[in-house]
């Protein structure tokens, strides 16, 4: 009877499940984003065609670029920068073409200098997108007006007009249809960060593997949302300083949790006698983190949670005081002493940061602050890094080569070829896959057949292209799929770049005019030849390769750690980079080519990264337990030995020579340091010092010992690496 009922109920539930899935789609973020992507594309092309624009493809290109920025604040910023960059770049392109087109040497030299400079400035922090659009618009105007300088003025006007149409289409769709506000998502992400901390703390307590990388990724995302949210709301902007401090609180809590991983107190004297009190503190902290991550925060409950942590901490301190009277406490092993002190220190730091975070939440400003006088120094662009300078020069050489080829040989699709040769050479190396230029020729081999199939399809479907219904279906479908990929990708991947140029090229076949075979051939040869030219210069001039990128990031990590040890504290930028570098290195490790890099070599690199990351987690530059003169001398000596080992590993990466580190002096210094710690503990016990003072000193000493263990392990692994491989170009 029951079986029969179940069998008859199952088919009838299928339509219900299908309907439930359909009705859930509008609540899915990727579906919403993809629908908006498609509608914005249709709207931009419709407006351009309705306006009888000469190049509706530029409006579509604008939609592709702007829609990737999913938040209102980000889109508004990029829209303004795109319009400003387009106007300036268009004027420069027009003036160069009108004045110097008849003198190719001067013309190409001036254009090359301008594009190289704007490309390089894309790599600094002040309105980089405007610089990119300056260069891109100058390239478009010059490549289209090269054969007819008198038309360059019209190309400039058309370009500006089409960009404005695309910007308006994106702003309209993003503002009216499921708008996403960075300010709102920041607050949601902030609560999510506390939930991540709660999960990490819980996993650390239970001894299960924990994903601390997720917290660093979320913090990086929150910093971006903070910037965009400030452009959306004056109310949010008034609270930015407090939100920055809250992100600092989250980062420091994460830093306090990390050293707790792998602590073994299961059978220690302190765990047996103070385990219940330790568990009480841990449970109170975990509950407070969960409250901070709740959708609706109750100020009263948070204050009660803070009081519960404080009560539990006092109970733990009293238990430790009572245990001092136990004669067995004087015979406890050093590892157990360091372990319990490290745990108590970390718990105390978490408690302090939680209290600070609660005060920040209670003290959020309600009134909007008055604006201060504008600091003009903040508007001056910075100096771009060396990579962006070389990348700008390289992509400009690719551009000039394509323009010379266009002028002398006049291949089909010349203007598309020029744009692709510059765009692919400049942007494909920084795609989020982390491969750089390693597979530039793979891209050529894959892209040409794909573009060929696209053009064959356009030839077969050319009668349908005059139908606006078919055109709209094609645009919406293509951009919907593109939106699905863009929603899940941090940045614009190689495949996304090529597919974008493919659709832009296809839409260049204006449906208001008969589509000829030659027009379709121009799309194929323009993209194909441009991809080949870009690949030639990608692989021959300063190629960006994952092994070199990995090597450089290891060197950067070692340098920041060494500078922090010498100066006593890293800069805010240095702290941020130390949190970002492990993820960037792992991305490059995944792209190392086998069998050039053996499995053992890659595993050693992973182990080295893990040891260096754990060394960072101990925050030695913030932990100086030496209070007496002899203690300060010992910690200074240990930090100098740390810096020496870090420097030797860095030199090995820089020179390609084997890493040779003698860890004997560090081991001897740690033994001497341990003896000093034991003496200092006994002295403080005899003086009945406050447990907070004792755990603070010995807990920081434990971090020194952990850091020494991690660094010596890193040196052993580094000695097994073939660092000469990381400077070579091993795979074309």
Question: What residues fall within each predicted segment?
Answer:
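A transmembrane helix-and-boundary motif of multi-pass membrane transporters/channels
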Residues: 1-239, 344, 355, 359-600, ...
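Cytosolic, long alpha-helical scaffolding segments
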Residues: 193-371, 408, 412, 556-732
């Amino acid at each position: 009877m029951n079986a029969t009922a179940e069998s008859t109920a199952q088919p009838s539930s299928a339509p219900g499940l299908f309907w439930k899935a359909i009705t859930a789609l509008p609540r899915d973020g990727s579906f919403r984003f993809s629908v908006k992507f498609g509608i914005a594309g249709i709207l931009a092309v419709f407006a351009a065609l309705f306006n009888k624009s000469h190049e509706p493809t530029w409006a579509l290109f604008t939609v592709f670029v702007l829609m990737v920025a999913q938040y209102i604040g980000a889109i508004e910023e990029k829209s303004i920068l795109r319009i400003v960059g387009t106007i300036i770049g268009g004027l420069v392109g027009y003036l160069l073409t009108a004045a110097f087109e008849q003198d190719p040497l001067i013309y190409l030299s001036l254009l090359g200098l301008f594009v190289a400079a704007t490309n390089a400035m894309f790599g600094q922090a002040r309105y980089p997108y405007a610089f990119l659009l300056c260069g891109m618009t100058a390239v478009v105007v010059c490549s289209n007006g090269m054969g007819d300088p008198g038309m360059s003025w019209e190309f400039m006007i058309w370009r500006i007009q089409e960009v404005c149409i695309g910007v308006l289409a994106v702003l309209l769709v993003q503002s009216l249809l499921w708008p996403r506000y960075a300010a709102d998502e920041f607050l949601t992400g902030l609560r999510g960060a506390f939930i991540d901390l709660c999960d990490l703390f819980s996993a650390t307590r239970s001894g299960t593997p924990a994903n601390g990388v997720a917290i660093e990724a979320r913090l990086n995302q929150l910093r971006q949302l903070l910037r965009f949210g400030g452009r959306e709301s004056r109310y949010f902007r008034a609270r930015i300083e407090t939100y920055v401090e809250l992100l600092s609180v989250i980062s420091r809590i994460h830093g306090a949790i990390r050293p707790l991983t792998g602590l073994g107190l299961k059978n220690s004297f302190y765990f047996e006698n103070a385990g219940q009190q330790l568990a009480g503190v841990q449970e109170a902290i975990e509950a407070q983190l969960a409250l901070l991550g709740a959708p609706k925060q109750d100020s009263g409950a948070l204050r009660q949670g803070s009081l519960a942590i404080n009560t539990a901490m006092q109970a733990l301190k009293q238990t430790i005081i009572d245990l001092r009277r136990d004669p067995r406490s004087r015979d406890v092993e050093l590892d157990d002493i360091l372990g319990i002190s490290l745990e108590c220190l970390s718990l105390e730091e978490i408690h302090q940061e939680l209290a600070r975070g609660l005060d920040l939440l209670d003290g959020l400003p309600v009134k909007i602050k008055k604006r201060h006088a504008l600091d003009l120094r903040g508007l001056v662009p910075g100096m771009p890094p060396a990579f962006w300078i070389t990348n700008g020069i390289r992509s400009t050489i690719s551009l000039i080569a394509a323009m010379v080829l266009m002028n002398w040989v006049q291949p089909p699709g010349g203007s598309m070829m020029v744009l692709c040769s510059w765009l692919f050479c400049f942007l494909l190396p920084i795609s989020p896959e982390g491969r750089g230029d390693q597979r530039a020729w793979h891209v050529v081999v894959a892209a040409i057949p794909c573009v060929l199939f696209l053009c064959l399809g356009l030839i077969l479907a050319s009668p349908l292209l005059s139908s606006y219904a078919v055109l709209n279906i094609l645009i919406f479908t293509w951009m919907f799929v593109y939106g699905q990929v863009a929603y899940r990708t941090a940045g614009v991947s190689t495949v996304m770049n090529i597919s974008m140029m493919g659709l832009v090229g296809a839409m260049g076949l204006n449906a208001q005019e008969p589509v000829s075979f030659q027009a379709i051939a121009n799309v194929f040869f323009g993209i194909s030849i441009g991809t080949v030219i870009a690949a030639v210069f990608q692989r021959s001039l300063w190629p960006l390769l994952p092994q070199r990128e990995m090597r450089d990031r290891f060197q950067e990590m070692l340098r920041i750690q060494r500078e922090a040890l010498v100066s006593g504290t890293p800069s805010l930028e240095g702290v941020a980079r130390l949190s970002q570098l492990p993820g960037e290195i792992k991305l490059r490790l995944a792209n190392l080519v086998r069998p050039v890099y053996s499995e053992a070599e890659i595993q050693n690199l992973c182990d080295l990264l893990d040891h260096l990351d754990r060394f960072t987690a101990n925050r030695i530059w913030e932990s100086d337990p030496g209070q007496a003169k002899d203690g300060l001398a010992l910690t200074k000596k240990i930090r100098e030995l740390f810096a020496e080992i870090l420097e030797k590993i860095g030199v090995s990466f820089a020179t390609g020579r084997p890493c040779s580190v003698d860890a004997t002096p560090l081991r001897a210094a740690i033994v001497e340091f341990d003896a000093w710690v034991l003496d200092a503990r006994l002295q403080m016990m005899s003086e009945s010092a406050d447990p907070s003072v004792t755990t603070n000193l010995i807990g920081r000493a434990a971090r020194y010992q952990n850091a020494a263990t991690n660094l010596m392990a890193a040196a052993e692994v580094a000695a097994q690496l073939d660092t000469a491989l990381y400077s070579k170009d091993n795979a074309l």
